[in-house]
Amino acid sequence: MDPILALADIHLGRKQSGDKKIGPGLAWALDALDQGAKAGARHLIMAGDIIDRKRFTEATYGEVNQFFEHALSLFDTVLFTSGNHDTHHNLDLPAGVTVASPSPATYLMGSCAVHTAGVEVDKDPRELVGSFPLLIDGTVNLGILHTSLTG
């Protein structure tokens, strides 16, 4: 199986210290991408909440694009599955980023079949695992849901 780096809940826009809710920040996120690639990951899954729902500025949208542009330079495949915070934004992601549908679907990442669905609305009430696509024989099957979805 081709190694996959999976990240979630980066919450770009949050301060890195001094607030009740903090985030790791862009420098950490870019370093995490570099470290994943250095460790041999060939694919990236960003499993939701790349940006914070409340704590963001216009510059944060540039940070989101910088994150994904850097990911595209490092990985063969970049898959973004939206999280509950992402639903509050109209993200215009760089060409080459695959954005997961809110309906359960399968995306091939090398020799791995990734079954996922993006969050549709904040506080998404759906239970999706039962409607996930069937396993694909002869490959590794990986199911990914953002933490705000249940199955």
Where do the PLM segments sit?
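N-terminal active-site segment of His-dependent metallophosphoesterases
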Residues: 1-63
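His/Asp/Glu-rich metal-coordinating catalytic cores
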Residues: 43, 54-151
